[in-house]
Amino acid sequence: DKTYFKGGTSLSKAYGLIERFSEDLDLFVFTGDKGASKQAEKTLNKKLSKYIAELNSDIYKEDLSETGGNYRKLYFSYDNVFQGVGLKEHLEVEIKSCDLPDKKLMFYPADKRVIKPIVTSFLESIGQDELISTYGLESFETQCINPRKTICDKVSRLVKLSYNEDATALLAKHIRDVYDLSALYHNQEYNDYLHSEDFLDAMYRVTIEDGLNKNSRSHLSLADAPIFKDA
């Protein structure tokens, strides 16, 4: 109950809102105690990172991984069957813990969602249910960060990138965020959300959160961001 699935991959696997392949897995960890210290949150992050690395020790790329502070990125090798299609060379697992001085300002709405592997759906469609149990491919339930938060995170990231001198190159590397936001915009529920006061309030809270984090650029105006100049 202290680990949350988030990001674009959760939009696909947990909510069925987008259709794209991703080699990234984003997780958020929280002790559940808003009075806990930053160190306690970092310790939880470290424990989870170590567990994931040890569980997949045969493919873990320790030399590439970043394992310090409240943000950790673990890399894992995999056999890439398809060549030249823009796939990353490694699987990435990003784990973020809360480092806000005042956790009362946290904005991480979450839901319990069922995750079903693609191969599980395929095996069910061809009547091979016994293989699902044989290989441990059953669906499972996990906590996921609500898409409303994911939308705000993606907007915030694109805004910050657009202020850089090499904005075009940086934004090109995050074109998946543009795709995700476009898909959500064309979903009636989230289109309504994007035109609501709730969205403005959520963006404000995310900006406050950014302002309390290290290396923040939340002072940059959202409305005046270069990415919106021709909008």
What is the role of each PLM region?
Residues 5-9:
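Glycine-rich beta-strand-to-loop/alpha-helix junction loops that act as flexible
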Residues 1-3, 13-19, 30-231:
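Structured mid-to-C-terminal alpha-helical surface segments
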